């Protein structure tokens, strides 16, 4: 009994001290990088915070009346555009793994431009810094913000909503918003389909198809085993060829993924890094920069392929987070570890308008420029961004949609179940051959 009382007392004291620390901002309730958080705040706080504090807590003032005021009598659920069906463009969004413009690094130089295609796009199309919710990791959280328009700061510390919510529950997204206008919706990823539970998540987000690595004939890989992004261009075009209407294609690349080797593994690197004295660190950055160069070649190839289709199109590129390299704010021109880069290419004459934007506002920004108003959260951003109580009302809206009573849906949720299929081709199994030691090989077409 004494031991139990001691545990209870310790728990109460821990909770009391923790709440004071949070109130005084000694510790944070938001983890942009879970590994860094463990270093900064220690095991007990980080473990308990990430284990027990998930989802969005009910905000003060959450009532049906408050949500009606935010919704403005159903305005957030409307779908509208001035464009005819022939004028609606294809929308391709490409998430570049661990990408940022290496010209923004201040502690090394490169023997030649590592991303000439992207630099050309920056000069001619809308671009800026892209504020992401994590640093050095957390790809799926940037995806979540982009696809849903929701701000990760209202979730638990270090939480991945892909794992805690969207893999189990239907979730309104850019796919459902554009499907309501007749778009075909496709997701692609040159890594395995179950990574971050994407197969379940994309199904619950309303995508029509998901083509993952298992449905690609990956022949080219990096020195540390990740698929090279050059394979994505063909599969993006193939996905668009499966429909007669306009398409929304959300593409997640993987080539820039860590770990980055401390030994020189590229025999004759196209790009050499200068200015770093530590040999191991130089090798890591030289490897990374050469992956960025090849990712940039993929960007150029994709733009060329889209141009050759001669269809109205918009292509968005952005980096999901900085690479895991121990970067510090003073290493970067932006002086901010949560900035990558984005650019919006188009062939429909959109005006160049440079600005810095957070990940959760990206799709609402793109859709607004296209005069497309669809999706509850995207409509909210378009109507309320920059107004009084914008962020506090966004928290209420996110809670209502995910964990509340869904007042804003008025009984008509945009998605109640998924319908996605894996891949875009019919797959048949012709034989199963047992291996000598264990397992089986599956053959088919």
What function would you assign to each model-found segment?
Residues 76-87, 95-96, 101-445:
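Solvent-exposed soluble domains appended to multi-pass membrane proteins
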Residues 1-89, 110-129, 164-168, 172, ...:
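N-terminal secretory/membrane-targeting segments
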């Amino acid at each position: 009994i004494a031991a139990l009382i001691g545990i209870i007392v310790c728990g109460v004291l821990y909770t009391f001290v923790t709440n004071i620390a949070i109130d005084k901002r000694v510790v944070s309730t938001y983890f942009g990088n879970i590994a860094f958080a463990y270093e900064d705040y220690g095991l007990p706080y980080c473990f308990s915070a990430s284990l027990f504090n998930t989802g969005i807590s009910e905000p003060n003032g959450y009532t049906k009346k408050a949500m009606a005021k935010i919704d403005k009598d159903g305005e957030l659920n409307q779908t509208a555009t001035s464009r005819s069906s022939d004028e609606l463009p294809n929308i391709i969004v490409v998430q570049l793994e661990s990408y940022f413009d290496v010209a923004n690094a201040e502690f090394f130089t490169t023997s030649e431009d590592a991303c000439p295609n992207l630099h050309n796009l920056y000069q001619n199309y809308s671009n800026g810094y892209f504020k992401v919710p994590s640093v050095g990791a957390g790809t799926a959280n940037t995806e979540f913000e982009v696809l849903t328009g929701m701000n990760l700061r209202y979730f638990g510390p270090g939480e991945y909503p892909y794992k805690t919510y969207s893999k189990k529950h239907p979730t309104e997204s850019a796919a459902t918003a554009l499907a309501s206008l007749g778009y075909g919706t496709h997701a692609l990823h040159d890594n395995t389909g179950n990574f971050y539970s994407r197969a379940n998540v994309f199904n619950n987000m309303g995508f029509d198809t998901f083509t993952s690595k298992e449905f690609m004939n990956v022949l080219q890989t990096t020195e540390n085993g990740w698929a090279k992004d050059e394979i994505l261009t063909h599969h993006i075009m193939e996905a668009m060829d499966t429909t007669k209407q306009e398409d929304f294609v959300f593409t997640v690349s993987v080539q820039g993924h860590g770990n980055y080797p401390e030994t020189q593994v590229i025999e004759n690197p196209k790009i050499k890094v200068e200015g770093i004295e530590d040999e191991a660190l130089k090798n890591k950055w030289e490897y990374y920069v050469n992956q960025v160069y090849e990712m940039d070649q993929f960007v150029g190839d994709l733009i060329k392929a889209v141009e050759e289709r001669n269809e109205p199109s918009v292509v968005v590129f952005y980096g999901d987070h900085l690479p895991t390299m121990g970067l510090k704010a003073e290493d970067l021109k932006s002086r901010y570890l949560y900035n990558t880069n984005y650019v919006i290419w188009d062939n429909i004459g959109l005006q160049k308008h440079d600005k810095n934007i957070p990940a959760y506002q990206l799709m609402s920004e793109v859709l607004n420029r296209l005069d497309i108003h669809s999706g509850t959260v995207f409509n909210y951003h378009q109507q309320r961004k920059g107004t009084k109580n914008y962020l506090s009302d966004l928290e209420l809206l996110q809670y209502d949609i995910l964990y509340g009573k869904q007042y804003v849906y008025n009984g008509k949720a945009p998605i109640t179940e998924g319908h996605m299929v894996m891949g875009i081709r019919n797959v048949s199994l012709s034989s199963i051959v047992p291996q000598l030691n264990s397992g089986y090989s599956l053959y088919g077409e």
